[in-house]
Amino acid sequence: AKVQAAWGAKTRGVLLASPSNPTGTSIAPDELRAIHEVVRAHGGLTLIDEIYLGLSYDEAFGHTALALGEDIISINSFSKYFNMTGWRLGWMVVPDAMVSVVERVAQNLFICASTIAQHAALACFEPESIALYEQRRSEFKARRDFFIPALNDLGLSIPVMPDGAFYAWADCTQAAKKLGVQGSWDFVLELMRRTHIAATPWRDFGSFETGHFIRFSTANSMAQLQEAIARLRRELA
């Protein structure tokens, strides 16, 4: 309904991210299908960022939107699930009619990926590599299962349990009051000063209902996350 209401004369499509950064939440399959049907009815394009798709922890999610039809544009990367951050290597799946157009754009932006990056990417699909990535995904889930409840207990409330990626999107309203500040920007600065814990304030993620939210990353080790909670507890408990 929101997509339908927002569609205007100049609208050409919808850009989605699932799982998303900063919330780590995914679009439910039924909701994604409904969105795509609205876009299709208007003759538009559904473009979806699936870069964190491999780091899904709920069986209800973790399935590519490409299953909805051949008119989906999917963007993905080797950076997250395949742990090749910094190699700047990814892929895009587009409808057949768009291939030649995308090729012209691509060859004027980056020509092609480096040889060493392509060989490294091929190694990602070896059984030994996949086993390592799946073990790593389980570790991310364990960190989430520890970190999110601990934040909630300290008054850094998580509105929706993340089902993917490695982030915690927390409302710092109550915690900021305990530190004598207001808003997420002042809160993260005070948090850094008191605990040496770095979090990302709302302003990096747009302006829609974000003013009292901050993002933590759970990409650190379990030991580091436990230490972070211990430091937060000393200030907020």
Stretches with model-predicted labels:
Residues 1-237:
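PLP-dependent class I/II
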